[in-house]
């Protein structure tokens, strides 16, 4: 009987669905595993990146179910976002219709691959019920002071007509549409992620060896903790008159280099720069260039060529009394430190590059034979008055102490991470649950009025905010004074939705109507035991999710400190050496692969072609190879004896049979290591192939039966449909269970022993593993007879299973 993938897969998907095989059990006393792959945006079709991600997660979920764990393996859709509005403009379809039509199609695709997702806990973040509790969380954060409003320069995408977080600007362009991003001053809501900066940094330590080092490093750098000295610099008298300021605050992490300062660099937004602009004390050329710098995103400023302009004013060095020129520079950010940086060109690469470009003084204050800039924090100070000959660290501490004693400076800790702006000027997002009242200012909506839903009668044109233009939707009553007011017309950044969905999944779905999170089930299921997704989310979703977990804990919603215990970042799926994309014409449609070869073939290829963390190059021949392997497995199963397993006696097997059985059990042993630690599914599949090849040389009916029983068990998480089919056909099994290793299989028939005389190796021999110590010693003497001739043995040493040492004289 030929292998018919479509019939087998549809049969088992129906059985699994009807019997709710993949729903988590209600018994919260069972050992649990929460396996979660990052949920998709409903773009309309799944792609091969999705197939790889979800196949990895599904293999783990199926394995842990099989060995007795209560498994939560949910899926949902990150369904708000700009693409729905873009589709509305392009195809003249409502964003909601476009989104939910896509969700329906993608559900069908996902389940056609046999993924063992919980259907009862499936959600879309655009569902009103999800929005209701997201708005509740927003209000609780606002009341706790974790969300606030301010007017600030924001990253503005002209194409999408919306604000972007710093993390969403890539090389000066919008991460979503690729359009140039400009700076624009706007009011908005901000999440106070900086309040958790220290905790976010410190708690990375608990994730070491469980998260990829690259992700940990990226988060450390993004949080960017620096400890240093904040101090005042007085302006000289003439400069005070021009700048309308008497001093400025400066921050440095290198107080030991204080005597090497040759200029101070200010951010364009610094108050002194703005005062000079207001008084028209800077020429038009400088004015234009300052505006150009202000229009750059923070990331652009720090990555572009260093540029600056002398402001014509000076500060006084607080220790030496020397005059220091003040410059405006593009690499200084207004919201880091004080927006002013003391520049030490001799000991900082950026400052050195700037000083060389503008011919500024370079003052060496650390002794070194190396070329400047010398940036290491090692060496003795020079040209630093009473601090000469001190090493850098000692000098740094003493200089800070002197500043504190003179009351002109203090030790401070700064972080690079900025508060997260979450206001977006778009329609298809969760409405921000706030109102604007002329009498009361801004105020949160009453919880009983949630969810604040979107109006459906809108015109999506791509110009401006549709909610702002709606004739009636904004009108409301102020919850404080009862007067007429207006709803906030901005919607939330979609990363807000994906920052807590994992906790919603962990809540018993029977409680979803009543509460955001069910304490009992969340306490049981969280944290996620294994999270799987792309490394591109390292400082976006993963950082926000970690913040949300801590904030929700402090708000009393849950108890765990971190959302994800272990993280696997899978590599991209490439074709012709490039990421699959329609523009490159190198897309492979999963539906076509499933139709031609079946879901199991697609799954097998995804896990066999490369280790999960590495990039995977699509290969049509390798897909064919995966299909042939399944066909061969199916064909060979037709010759296996059906019925109950016959017990095998290891001692009754011949050499070839023992070897084949050993290979089968080695694969079973490897499965434990692969599923629990390495995720090297490719090596596990290879081990199964090796076992089947060894088995082909044997004609032992009982051995073949046992081997197939074990190999189907090993491969079930990877190619579940065909394994369930063959297991039912051969063994009347409709489910899989944990298998135990048989230690006697691993016992070697022969021992390879070395013989040493007076510690020097003289011979090697093979002997039966069942031989006694006396037999082994006799055989050792026989093999070394020529060295023993005329000698007497004074001591015989046998190290079991390894060597014999004879001491002679």
From Swiss-Prot:
What coarse category fits the chief subcellular location reported for this protein? cytoplasm
Write down the chemical reaction(s) this protein catalyses: tRNA(Leu) + L-leucine + ATP = L-leucyl-tRNA(Leu) + AMP + diphosphate
- The UniProt annotation places ATP binding at 582
Q: Name one Pfam family in it.
A: tRNA-synt_1_2
Motif 'HIGH' region per record, residues: 40-50
Q: InterPro entries this protein is in?
A: aa-tRNA-synth_I_CS (IPR001412), Leu-tRNA-ligase (IPR002302), Leu_tRNA-synth_edit (IPR025709), M/V/L/I-tRNA-synth_anticd-bd (IPR013155), Methionyl/Leucyl_tRNA_Synth (IPR015413), Rossmann-like_a/b/a_fold (IPR014729), tRNAsynth_Ia_anticodon-bd (IPR009080), Val/Leu/Ile-tRNA-synth_edit (IPR009008)
List its EC numbers.
6.1.1.4
Q: What is the main EC category here?
A: ligase
Extract one GO molecular function annotation from the record. ATP binding
Q: Which NCBIfam families does its entry note?
A: leuS_bact
Q: Which family does it belong to?
A: Belongs to the class-I aminoacyl-tRNA synthetase family.
Name used for this protein in its record = Leucine--tRNA ligase
Supply the source organism for this entry.
Campylobacter jejuni subsp. doylei (strain ATCC BAA-1458 / RM4099 / 269.97)
State the organism's lineage. Bacteria, Pseudomonadati, Campylobacterota, Epsilonproteobacteria, Campylobacterales
**Which gene codes for it?**
leuS
């Amino acid at each position: 009987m030929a292998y018919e993938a479509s019939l087998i897969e549809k049969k088992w998907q129906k059985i699994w669905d009807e019997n709710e095989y993949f729903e988590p059990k209600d018994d919260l006393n069972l050992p649990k595993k929460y396996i979660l792959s990052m949920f998709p945006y409903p773009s309309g079709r799944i792609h091969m990146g999705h197939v790889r991600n979800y196949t990895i997660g599904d293999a783990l979920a199926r394995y842990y179910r099989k060995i007795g764990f209560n498994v939560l393996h949910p899926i949902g859709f990150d369904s708000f976002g700009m693409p729905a509005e873009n589709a509305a403009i392009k195809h003249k379809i409502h964003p909601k219709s476009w989104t939910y039509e896509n969700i329906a199609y993608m559900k069908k695709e996902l389940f056609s691959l046999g993924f063992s997702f919980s259907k009862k806990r499936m959600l879309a973040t655009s569902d009103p019920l999800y929005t209701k509790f997201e708005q509740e969380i927003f209000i609780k954060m606002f009341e706790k002071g974790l969300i606030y409003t301010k007017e600030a320069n924001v990253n503005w995408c002209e194409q999408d007509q919306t604000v972007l977080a710093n993390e969403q600007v890539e090389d000066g362009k919008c991460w979503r549409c690729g359009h140039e991003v400009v700076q624009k001053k706007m009011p908005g809501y901000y999440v106070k992620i900086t309040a958790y900066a220290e905790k976010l940094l410190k708690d990375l330590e608990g994730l070491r060896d469980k998260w990829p080092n690259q992700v940990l490093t990226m988060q450390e750098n993004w949080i960017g903790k620096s400890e240093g000295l904040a101090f005042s610099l007085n302006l000289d008298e003439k400069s005070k008159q021009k700048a309308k300021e008497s001093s400025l605050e400066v921050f440095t992490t290198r107080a030991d280099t204080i005597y090497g300062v040759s200029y101070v660099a200010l951010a364009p937004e610094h108050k002194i720069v703005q005062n000079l602009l207001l008084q028209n004390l800077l020429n038009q050329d400088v004015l234009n260039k300052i505006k150009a710098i202000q229009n750059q995103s923070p990331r652009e400023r720090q990555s572009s060529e260093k540029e600056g302009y002398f402001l014509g004013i000076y500060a006084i060095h607080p220790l030496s009394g020397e005059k220091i020129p003040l410059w405006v520079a593009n690499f200084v950010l207004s919201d880091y430190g004080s927006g002013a940086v003391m520049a030490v060109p001799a000991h900082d690469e950026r400052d050195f590059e700037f000083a060389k470009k503008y011919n500024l003084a370079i003052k060496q204050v650390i002794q070194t034979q190396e070329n400047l800039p010398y940036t290491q924090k090692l060496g003795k100070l020079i040209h630093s008055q009473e601090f000469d000959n001190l090493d850098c660290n000692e000098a740094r501490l003493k200089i800070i102490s002197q500043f504190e004693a003179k009351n002109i400076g203090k030790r401070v800790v700064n972080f690079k991470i900025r508060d997260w702006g979450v206001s977006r000027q778009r329609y298809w997002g969760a409405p921000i649950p706030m109102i604007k009242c002329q009498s009361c200012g801004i105020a949160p909506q009453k919880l009983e009025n949630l969810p604040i839903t979107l109006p459906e009668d809108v015109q999506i044109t791509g110009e401006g905010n549709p909610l702002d233009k709606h004739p009636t939707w904004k009108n409301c009553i102020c919850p404080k004074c009862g007067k007429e007011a207006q709803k906030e017309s901005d919607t939330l950044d979609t990363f807000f939705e994906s920052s807590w969905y994992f906790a919603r999944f962990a809540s018993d779905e029977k409680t979803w109507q009543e509460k955001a999170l069910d304490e009992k089930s969340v306490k049981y299921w969280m944290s996620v035991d294994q999270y799987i997704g792309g490394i591109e989310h390292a400082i976006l979703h993963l950082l926000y999710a970690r913040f949300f977990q801590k904030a929700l804990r402090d708000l009393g919603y849950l108890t765990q400190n971190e959302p994800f215990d272990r993280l696997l970042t899978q590599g991209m799926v490439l074709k012709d050496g490039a990421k699959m994309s329609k523009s490159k014409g190198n897309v492979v449609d999963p539906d076509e692969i499933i139709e031609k070869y079946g879901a199991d073939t697609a799954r097998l290829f995804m896990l066999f072609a490369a280790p999960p963390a590495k990039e995977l190059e699509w290969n049509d021949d390798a897909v064919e190879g995966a299909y042939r392997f399944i066909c061969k497995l199916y064909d060979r199963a037709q010759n296996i004896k059906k019925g109950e397993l016959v017990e095998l006696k290891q001692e009754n097997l011949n050499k070839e049979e023992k070897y084949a059985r050993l290979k089968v059990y080695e694969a079973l042993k490897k499965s434990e290591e692969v599923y629990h630690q390495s995720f090297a599914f490719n090596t596990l599949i290879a081990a199964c192939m090796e076992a089947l090849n060894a088995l082909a040389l044997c004609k032992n009916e009982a051995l073949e039966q046992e081997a197939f029983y074990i190999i189907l068990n090993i491969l079930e998480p990877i190619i579940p449909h065909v394994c369930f089919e063959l297991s039912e056909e051969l063994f009347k099994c409709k489910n899989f269970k944990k298998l135990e290793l048989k230690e006697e299989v691993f016992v070697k028939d022969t021992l390879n022993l070395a013989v040493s005389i007076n510690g020097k190796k003289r011979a090697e021999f093979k002997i039966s593993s069942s031989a006694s110590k006396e037999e082994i010693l006799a055989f050792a003497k026989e093999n070394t007879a020529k060295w023993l001739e005329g000698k007497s043995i004074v001591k015989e040493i046998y190290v079991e299973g390894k060597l014999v040492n004879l001491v002679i004289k």
